[in-house]
């Protein structure tokens, strides 16, 4: 009788069964989710029979612009600036310094363009588009007939030493690019418009946008071409780009199968009057990943033609017309990248990481705020209700 009173088994067993059910449920749910994850991982996003990007070849060379030193920017010891030259095609700069110390770069007679690589990227990623532009202008007579006012393009490229711009260094890169724009434009005194084309890949597109907003009073930038750039400011810790000037044209090229920068973040929250975007994977009918967007053969053909087409035009309206004509032309023979069923589900899940990260940061921020308010309330209550004295 005593043991029954001390240990009420009738109350303990139901609770034990309840806990076991919860444990079993969690284990089964984990197994199901893991099995589903393994199964989805084994499913290819695109069919192996799907047409792929054409491989490209070039003969790159890079001339470092040492004249862009500490007298022009305090980041000269941290970053570098190069001029791309396609071997046996482009005119090589004179290695002998002139009286200005610009190593012969003042003899350049083309249209300047500045390439800005992305997070942990390389300045050499400019080579694919730059090489094709040189071939089109110097060796392909079709484009000279199609664009009689075209000029050759001098591609400059910024080297951030593979810096993680998605997490740090973005502000330094913006200041460096802003100063580089002014330096490059001064190399072209014969250019009456003093304009430069900015090309940014991934986070480099954000650097270009912010730098262009700082250059607004000088009007050195009138068009920006971005490749797989998250324009909607998905990362709260980075500088915002909402102050983008309306006088600058913005072309956003992205891929619907990009896992790093999904289509949901490629459109800026506040569009300018001259904004244009296109899904390159859908337009060309080939899967293009985040890195492939700078070298994919089919895409670089259109990008290079567009750049050659706008090189001899002076007004922003005319330049935007060229881009829209090339990227919104006849699509009868082209089609979307075929992704259906579970492959599409896998793609959406993999692309949702940006939104999950934003929600996590949002939840952490408000958790810290609520905890701080609770602690302040406790302190306030403690000081306004002192303990009674005896």
From Swiss-Prot:
Involved in inositol deacylation of GPI-anchored proteins which plays important roles in the quality control and ER-associated degradation of GPI-anchored proteins. The chain crosses the membrane at residues 21-41, 354-374. Its EC number is 3.1.-.-. One of its GO terms (cellular component) is endoplasmic reticulum membrane. It is found in: Endoplasmic reticulum membrane. This is GPI inositol-deacylase. Lacks the C-terminal half of the classical GPI inositol-deacylases. One of its GO terms (molecular function) is phosphatidylinositol deacylase activity. InterPro entries: AB_hydrolase_fold (IPR029058), PGAP1-ab_dom-like (IPR012908), PGAP1/BST1 (IPR039529).
């Amino acid at each position: 009788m005593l043991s029954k009173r001390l240990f009420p088994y009738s109350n303990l067993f139901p609770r034990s069964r309840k806990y076991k059910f919860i444990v079993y449920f969690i284990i089964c749910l984990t197994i199901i989710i893991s099995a589903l994850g393994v199964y989805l991982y084994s499913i290819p996003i695109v069919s192996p029979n799907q047409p792929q990007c054409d491989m490209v070849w070039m003969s790159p060379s890079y001339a470092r612009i040492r004249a862009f030193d500490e007298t022009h920017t305090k980041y000269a010891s941290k970053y570098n600036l190069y001029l791309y030259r396609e071997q046996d095609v482009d005119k090589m700069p004179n290695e002998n310094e002139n009286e200005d110390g610009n190593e012969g770069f003042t003899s350049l007679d083309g249209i300047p363009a500045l390439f800005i690589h992305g997070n942990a990227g390389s300045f050499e990623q400019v080579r694919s588009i730059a090489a094709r532009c040189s071939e089109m202008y110097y060796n392909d007579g079709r484009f000279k007939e199609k664009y009689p006012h075209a000029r050759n393009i001098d591609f400059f490229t910024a080297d951030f030493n593979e810096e993680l711009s998605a997490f740090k260094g973005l502000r330094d890169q913006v200041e460096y690019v802003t100063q580089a724009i002014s330096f490059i434009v001064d190399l072209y005194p014969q250019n009456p418009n003093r304009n430069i084309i900015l090309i940014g890949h991934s986070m480099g597109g954000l650097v270009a946008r912010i730098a262009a907003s700082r250059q607004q009073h000088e009007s050195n930038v009138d068009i920006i071409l971005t490749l797989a750039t998250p324009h909607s400011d998905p990362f709260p810790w980075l500088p915002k780009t909402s102050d983008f000037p309306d006088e600058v044209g913005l072309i956003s090229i992205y891929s619907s199968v990009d896992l790093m920068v999904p289509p949901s973040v490629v459109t800026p929250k506040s569009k300018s009057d001259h904004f244009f975007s296109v899904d390159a994977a859908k337009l060309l009918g080939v899967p293009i990943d985040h890195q492939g967007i700078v070298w994919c053969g089919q895409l670089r053909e259109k990008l290079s033609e567009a750049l050659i087409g706008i090189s001899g035009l002076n007004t922003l309206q005319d330049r935007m017309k060229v881009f829209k004509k090339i990227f919104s032309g006849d699509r009868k023979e082209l089609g979307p990248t075929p992704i259906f069923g579970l492959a599409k589900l896998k793609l959406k899940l993999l692309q949702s990481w940006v939104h999950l990260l934003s929600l996590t940061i949002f939840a952490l921020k408000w958790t810290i705020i609520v905890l701080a308010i609770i602690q302040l309330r406790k302190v306030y209550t403690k000081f306004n209700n002192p303990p009674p004295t005896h």
